[in-house]
């Protein structure tokens, strides 16, 4: 089914590779990037403060993941870093540790600013930062849209060490001078591929203009399109590069399958047939539009299947409640869109269903990286209509993976 490139395939892997090569081969590139290959196989070998180590171990980390083994120390040294690793490999804890190691806790001023593309992801980073910094007494605040501006201003006025937020609200706080940039010495872009997409690029530039000229910059991402690398040149000073080649973006530990559903209308019955299997574990179902989230939720509930749903049109409070229920396990099947893929950090998720295939190969990683987090096993099931065959081919070529047809014994895989 996916053995040959359909004509007119939207994604051209050769073009991607040649653009990346062209960028990395430019005359000044060698001066711009330096590679960083030092590996620290234990958190104890990284020279971290005792109370930060306590927080790391209390959070449940035992051994650093590959990106943490290479990424924490250069950030702690104050170097500008570009780091690429798939979702679920511990990127967030990498930059949180680097920030927490360098803060001056006696100075209750904002010293680190972290930007994220969605409210959910910003709030997730805030939680990780607070947990890892529990024994250090770190003060963190998430500035995101859909919450009270006055409350943000009150908390910022009382003093924080770290602000995490979405670009719109952070820029608003800087513009109102509620967030003072004078002490900011670290600036992190998380999920930079999304952040630097056209929607956020201008806001990030505006924010960067307001920050002190001497600042450490960290760029973290699961995928690193050439455009993102190009933009980092404007922000960064001789960064070290910890970059996974595209063919090394393995989705290790995640078994991937497709179900040939032929037509769009047949997807619902296929999902209902799978529902008993889904409810064994925690599952996330991705569709491509907010309207479809509502439609599928209604259809599933109409057939007496318990599901919860979240998308960007819901108010923040409702989304928070739904995510809390899902994290606690009281709701087990969540229907959502790409927009929120990056804010779902639920350790128990072991099944992701792409009811709709993503419209871009890059988003596939963000979606299915929700399962099999930190080495746990995960399963991804892709519903594929005739119209989707081209995208399935593109995804396999982009990640250098083979996606097999779903076997009958799917329950045994979970």
UniProtKB/Swiss-Prot annotation:
One of its GO terms (molecular function) is ATP binding. One of its GO terms (cellular component) is cytoplasmic stress granule. Its EC number is 3.6.4.13. PANTHER family: ATP-DEPENDENT RNA HELICASE DBP3. ATP binds at residues 85-92. A motif (DEAD box) lies at residues 190-193. Belongs to the DEAD box helicase family. eIF4A subfamily. It is an enzyme of class 3 (hydrolase). This is Eukaryotic initiation factor 4A-1. Gene3D superfamilies: P-loop containing nucleotide triphosphate hydrolases (3.40.50.300). It catalyses: ATP + H2O = ADP + phosphate + H(+). ATP-dependent RNA helicase which is a subunit of the eIF4F complex involved in cap recognition and is required for mRNA binding to ribosome. In the current model of translation initiation, eIF4A unwinds RNA secondary structures in the 5'-UTR of mRNAs which is necessary to allow efficient binding of the small ribosomal subunit, and subsequent scanning for the initiator codon. Keywords: ATP-binding, Helicase, Hydrolase, Initiation factor, Nucleotide-binding, Protein biosynthesis, RNA-binding. eIF4F is a multi-subunit complex, the composition of which varies with external and internal environmental conditions. It is composed of at least EIF4A, EIF4E and EIF4G. Residues 72-242 form the Helicase ATP-binding domain. It comes from the Eukaryota. One of its GO terms (biological process) is cytoplasmic translational initiation. InterPro entries: DEAD/DEAH_box_helicase_dom, Helicase_ATP-bd, Helicase_C-like, P-loop_NTPase, RNA-helicase_DEAD-box_CS, RNA_helicase_DEAD_Q_motif. A motif (Q motif) lies at residues 41-69.
